[in-house]
Structure formats: C-alpha cells, structure tokens
Amino acid sequence: MPWLQVRLAISPEQAETYEDALLEVGAVSVTFMDAEDQPIFEPELNTTPLWTHTHLLALFEADTNAELALAHLSLLTGAELPEHSAEVIEDQDWERSWMDNFQPMCFGQRLWIVPSWHAAPQPDAVNLLLDPGLAFGTGTHPTTALCLEWLDGQDLKGCNVLDFGCGSGILAIAALLLGAEQAVGTDIDVQALEASRDNAGRNNIAAERFPLYLPEDLPPQQADVLVANILAGPLVSLAPQLTTLIKTGGRLALSGILAEQGEDVAAAYAESFDLDPIANRDGWVRITGRRR
C-alpha cells in the first residue's frame, strides 16, 4: 500500500523532540538520514551521533492529512517547523529489492562471496555463502574487499587464523575455505558472534574449526595469521596485545583505516613487524606485514 512520507531538515539537537512528536501525531516509523554525505568515524562508546545536517523521514498511513499532521507537529514542538516536505510514496518489497541488488563478488583469483539465495557463478571456485542480514561485513566495503583479496593471495594451508573483530565472520570463513586449519573469531558484539556462527554453518564449517569468543574470553594462543578489520583508533591502542597474539614469522593484515590514518597505524606496528607497502582503495587502506 502507499504511504505518506514527511521529510524534515533538522539539527542533531532537535532529533529527539521531533522523533517523539512525530510518533505522537501518528507516524508509524521515524528514520534519520545523512543530508550531506557526512561520514561519522569512530564515535565514542555508548553514543549514537547524528550528522550535522540530518533528514528525518516519517511514514504515515496514506490517508493521513499532511497539513493537519504538520500543524499538530508545530503545536507539540512549540516552534515553527524547519524546512520540510510531504509526498505519497508507493510501497515496495524492500527485502526483495535489496536481495536483487546484492550480487556475487569475486576477490582475487579464487574467492567468491555469494549471497545464500544466489547460485554460485563458478561452482568450482572457492565460494563463501553469506547471508548479510545483520550490519556486518559483506565484502562490499573497500576494507573488507582489501582483506579478502589479501587472504586469497596467501598460502593458508594448515594455518591457525585469528579474526579480531570478526563481525559476520566473513574473513575467518574465507580463510578456512582457502585452506586454513582453524580460525578463531572474537568480537565485542554478541550479535556479531551469532552472525559468524550462522554463516559458518551455512558454509558447512564445523564449530570446532571456528570457535568464537568475546575478547575477555579469548584463549592466550598465538596465530599464524591475524586479520583485524576494525578502526584505526583501536588498532593503535591494541597494537601490543595483537602483536603478542601472532607467532614469530606470522602474518598480519589490518584494515578499517582511512588513508590519512595509515601512517599512524603502521607506526604502531613497525617495531615488531616487517611491513609491506600500504594498499589503498577508495580512501581506505590495508596494512600487512610479518612478525619479526
């Protein structure tokens, strides 16, 4: 069915007031969107910052009188409404539309990431089946792609891999499918561990080959290969810990790093690793090396 969509241009300080007021006047959903393509990187813990210029989208049933709803909204907030618009939009099968847009992707020479509902384009390739139903890595972001391509180029036969900040489990599962003996995943988010476990099962990875832990429960064992696709700040602060988790001669791959942050992150690891040239893609970088 169609919906009435109301769009308001607000500041972060106005967000809570207008969200509550819109729900009060009958909105069935309220969504915040970036109005100017402003990225927010590394927010403080336990915060959900909004963009400097934010669009608030509210959906109402199609027979809602837009003028009356907006007038009521102005009364509730006690202020003149900010820049706004209202239009009727047709309903869509959002899930089907999203699924149609998520297509198989190739990384390197052997590895394909294939949506679980899609046939593998190359059945004889290394095909990782993924259900990106939660907001964790799918391969579409440059940092994930950089890590997957690096893994595809490594000889992982018999290796023990640690995926620090495993998210969907995409990197660890890729390593296992590419020949690793075992991969350990750790993440601060319990939902990420659940997503990793589900995706491992989808790829017929036995639980003993892919144990999953919260960071505080991670066993003190060293890996042959460590991958961490998180953020620059944590990568710098965790450098001493991550270094101890890699065997002498072991390999390291770090991403989640903006190009302008690359040198600072590399400097945090340079004392203990022989680092390769930094790989760059679309403003993001990957740092790799081998522990001395």
From Swiss-Prot:
It is found in: Cytoplasm. CDD domains: AdoMet_MTases. S-adenosyl-L-methionine binds at T144, G165, D187, N229. GO terms for biological process: methylation. Keywords: Cytoplasm, Methyltransferase, S-adenosyl-L-methionine, Transferase. Methylates ribosomal protein L11. HAMAP family: Methyltr_PrmA. This is Ribosomal protein L11 methyltransferase. It comes from Pseudomonas syringae pv. tomato (strain ATCC BAA-871 / DC3000). The gene is prmA.
